[in-house]
């Protein structure tokens, strides 16, 4: 969670002032961070989770299995991934999501936050 917290400090959110940080732990033990990056054309903004996942996918094509993602925002507790991010994380086999609910860390199996999901094995 400390990596996600640190990533939230790098967010670019001049319009909403809603800072989010994410940290991904891969099966290979690597950690990748991301923060939300807003754009004046709001639809072009990218969430912290997708930012971290694209960094992971680019950094090491052999280590693209997500063991867990931690998500943090100083603006909201808990801060869960949005629907688009959940589907994006699903692509890389995310197993667990960790959020800080203000009183401590909460862990959720990925299937609990995206039940009956569609993934690569469905094609």
Predicted segment positions?
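Zn2+-dependent cytidine deaminase-like catalytic core
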Residues: 33-122
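Small-residue (primarily alanine) positions within well-ordered alpha-helices
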Residues: 4, 22-23, 52
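Short beta-strand scaffold segments in enzyme catalytic cores
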Residues: 17-26
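Short, basic/aromatic recognition patches
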Residues: 1-13
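Short solvent-exposed loop/turn micro-motifs enriched in small/polar/acidic residues
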Residues: 15-17, 92
């Amino acid at each position: 969670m400390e990596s996600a917290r640190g990533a939230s400090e790098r967010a670019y959110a001049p319009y909403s002032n809603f800072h989010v940080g994410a940290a991904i732990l891969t099966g290979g033990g690597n950690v990748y961070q991301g923060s939300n990056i807003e754009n004046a054309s709001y639809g072009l903004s990218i969430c912290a989770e997708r930012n971290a996942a694209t960094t992971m996918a680019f950094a090491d094509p052999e280590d693209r299995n997500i063991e867990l993602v931690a998500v943090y925002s100083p603006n909201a507790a808990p801060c869960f991934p949005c629907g688009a991010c959940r589907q994006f994380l699903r692509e890389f086999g995310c197993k667990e999501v960790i959020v800080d609910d203000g009183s401590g860390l909460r862990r959720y199996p990925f299937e609990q936050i995206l039940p009956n999901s569609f993934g690569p094995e469905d094609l």
